[in-house]
């Protein structure tokens, strides 16, 4: 963003949102290809020789607006040396530059909305990290959760209409509309696939931007209600949630929606409401009754359809009771369970046994899916019995031990936020014995012989980083270190498991 300031007149761009003239500037394409702005992309890479010149951009846009553009390119590719077979390359570069342009108004508003706020200056935080404080909230006091599949736009014109609130440049919107409708492979740019969304590998930057702007509008109702009621803001998740972009739009939506929602706001003033978005779905947990959650369900459907023309159905929102439902987030299974407890009370000569049930929210390691993944990777059979890894038999002994140990350490690191880590001992057993069987197969020996000769060394490789730190910090207080290790620890570098830690 600092590089933009050297080339853009920020006051004029921020006031009028005119970005179309910038598409003819060479440095926009340098930014799109991560080139430095101090050099010309023409001199730095001969592959981009004269591709982003003003003349090419003008001719390409003019040619794109012709109805017979695709036919013309197919029939005249050999006779037109200026465009020729590279027309798709020019279109690709033009679209990449356009993706940078449409992000400018959003980036400027985000910077202005964050001024004066105490926010952690970290580039590693993402909106997905708001799941961690979401799982640390007081879920044991909540009753219901709405499992919402984010509505997707059936018609691409909805995406263009969404950007009209931010980009006032009509020419830019026309060009975006042409990009979306001209090329066949972009007609289904956002397609729902199970619970998530898939994007084309080409031009992923623009596709992700359009999808995020779409979700930004979808989540606007939560911004408004959160601003109206101080209870909607979770103290523990405030730092993370402030980094999610749609909270930068609070002032705008208050001005737009205040008059429309005064009559029905009383329905939704819930002192215990928690919201998070994960992939293609979002979760709304509340202490409210079943009737209140049903009101939320049908109100959200009507709100999306009437105000944003986003087609949705009540069947895409599932209401579940937390005591009978498990949340599947980031590979964890989270649920509220009842811990029975009996208290003995004595009054004078009479004693009473009082049964009490205490709610507790647990994040559990999904052991069965993990064993299934290990089985597919040929570390064990479907029942979880360890087997050897023949394809690794050609490696050295140290490499074999290191690979097995790294897989377990990464899995342990990923599931460090679990409240019950006992399941990881089974994974540790499978990988440790699988490593021993692989070594025994390589040296044509027995497993017992290798465990006897390399037992301590093999066991040390499976120590996790947390266990090593605690053992060094508390060498004599093993109980203290184990107690600390049992606590849930969330690491910000956790995004996804990469095929069993890229074995």
Swiss-Prot record:
It comes from the Eukaryota. It is found in: Plastid, Chloroplast. The keyword rRNA-binding does not apply. GO terms for cellular component: chloroplast. Belongs to the intron maturase 2 family. MatK subfamily. One of its GO terms (molecular function) is RNA binding. Usually encoded in the trnK tRNA gene intron. Probably assists in splicing its own and other chloroplast group II introns. The lineage of its organism: Eukaryota, Viridiplantae, Streptophyta, Embryophyta, Tracheophyta. Its main location: plastid. The keyword Disulfide bond does not apply. Keywords: Chloroplast, mRNA processing, Plastid, RNA-binding, tRNA processing. InterPro entries: Domain_X, Maturase_MatK, Maturase_MatK_N. This is Maturase K. It comes from Diospyros kaki. GO terms for biological process: mRNA processing; RNA splicing; tRNA processing. Pfam families: Intron_maturas2 (PF01348), MatK_N (PF01824).
């Amino acid at each position: 963003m600092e590089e933009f300031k050297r080339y853009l007149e920020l006051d004029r761009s921020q006031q009028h949102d005119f970005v179309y003239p910038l598409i003819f500037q060479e440095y926009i394409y340098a930014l799109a290809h991560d080139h430095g702005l101090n050099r010309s992309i023409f001199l730095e890479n001969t592959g981009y020789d004269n591709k982003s010149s003003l003349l090419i951009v003008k001719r390409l846009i003019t040619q794109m607006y012709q109805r017979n553009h695709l036919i013309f390119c197919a029939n005249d590719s050999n006779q037109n040396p200026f465009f020729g077979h590279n027309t798709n390359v020019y279109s690709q570069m033009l679209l990449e530059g356009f993706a940078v342009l449409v992000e400018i108004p959003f980036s400027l508003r985000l910077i202005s909305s964050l001024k004066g706020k105490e926010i952690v200056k970290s580039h590693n935080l993402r909106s997905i990290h708001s799941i961690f404080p979401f799982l640390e909230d007081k879920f044991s006091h909540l009753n219901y959760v709405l499992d919402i599949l984010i509505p997707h736009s059936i018609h691409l014109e909805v995406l263009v209409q969404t950007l009209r609130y931010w980009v006032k440049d009509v020419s830019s919107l026309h060009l975006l509309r042409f990009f979306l409708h001209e090329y066949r492979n972009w007609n289904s740019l956002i397609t729902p696939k199970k619970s998530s969304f898939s994007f084309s590998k080409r031009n992923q930057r623009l596709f992700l931007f359009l999808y995020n702007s779409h979700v930004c509008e979808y989540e606007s109702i939560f911004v408004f209600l959160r601003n109206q009621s101080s209870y909607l803001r979770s103290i523990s998740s405030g730092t993370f949630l402030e980094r999610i972009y749609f909270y930068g739009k609070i002032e705008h939506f208050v001005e737009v929606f205040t008059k429309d929602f005064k009559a029905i706001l009383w329905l939704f003033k819930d002192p215990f409401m928690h919201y998070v978005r994960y992939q293609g779905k979002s979760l709304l947990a509340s202490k409210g009754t079943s009737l209140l959650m049903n009101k939320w369900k049908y109100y959200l459907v009507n709100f999306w359809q009437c105000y944003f023309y986003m087609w949705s159905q009540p069947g895409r929102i599932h209401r579940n009771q937390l005591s009978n439902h498990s949340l599947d987030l980031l590979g964890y299974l989270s649920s509220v369970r009842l811990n029975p407890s009996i208290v003995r009370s004595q009054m004078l000569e009479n004693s009473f046994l009082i049964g009490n049930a205490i709610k507790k929210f647990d994040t559990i390691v999904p052991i069965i899916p993990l064993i299934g993944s290990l089985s597919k990777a040929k570390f064990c059979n479907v029942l979880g019995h360890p087997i050897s890894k023949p394809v690794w038999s050609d490696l050295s002994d140290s490499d074999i031990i290191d690979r097995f140990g790294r897989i377990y350490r990464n899995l342990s690191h990923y599931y460090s936020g679990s409240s019950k880590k006992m399941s990881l001992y089974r994974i540790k057993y499978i990988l440790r014995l699988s490593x021993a069987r692989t070594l025994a197969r390589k040296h044509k020996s027995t497993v017992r012989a290798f465990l006897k000769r390399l037992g301590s060394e093999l066991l040390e490789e499976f120590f996790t980083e947390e266990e090593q730190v605690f053992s060094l910090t508390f060498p004599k207080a093993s109980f203290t270190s184990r107690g600390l290790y049992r606590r849930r620890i969330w690491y910000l570098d956790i995004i996804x498991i990469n095929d069993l830690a890229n074995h």
